[in-house]
Amino acid sequence: MVVVSLLAELIRVIYTDNQKHPVTAFLQNCSITVIRGEDAEIVLNRNLTIDINQYPDNARIESLLCDSTGRISDRFIHANIDEQIILIHNAKMGDQTRQRLLAGVSWDESVDILNADSVLSHITITGNDSSILLSKLGVNPKELKTGEWLNF
């Protein structure tokens, strides 16, 4: 599994290089949902506070999910990658949010809403020398852009 091997390599690199290049990596406590299908964007636009159609692929998008009274029930970070949308959101709300999104799917819409909590991880790397760590993991720091996801 790519995420597990990347995480193991990240821990190894941080452990061996932390004296020379102090950085910190956090494995974020979050829930991850993958939405795919012909009508995925339609279902999300019906439920979220933004129109995700106005953003290009690989754009980093943030939005909210509100209940019928207008109260915020979850916050999302989106990654539109290939033919699927990855939602990173509150760890405690994962199952409830997926149920709510699923309830908003019409009988004639083609959408899969998948639990990816144990498949994908959200890792945050911080520190003055984080570019050195990224390079050792095979990521070219010059390819990183604010507001965009990078596949590697």
PLM region descriptions:
Residues V2-F152:
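Basic, glycine/lysine-rich polyanion-binding surfaces/domains
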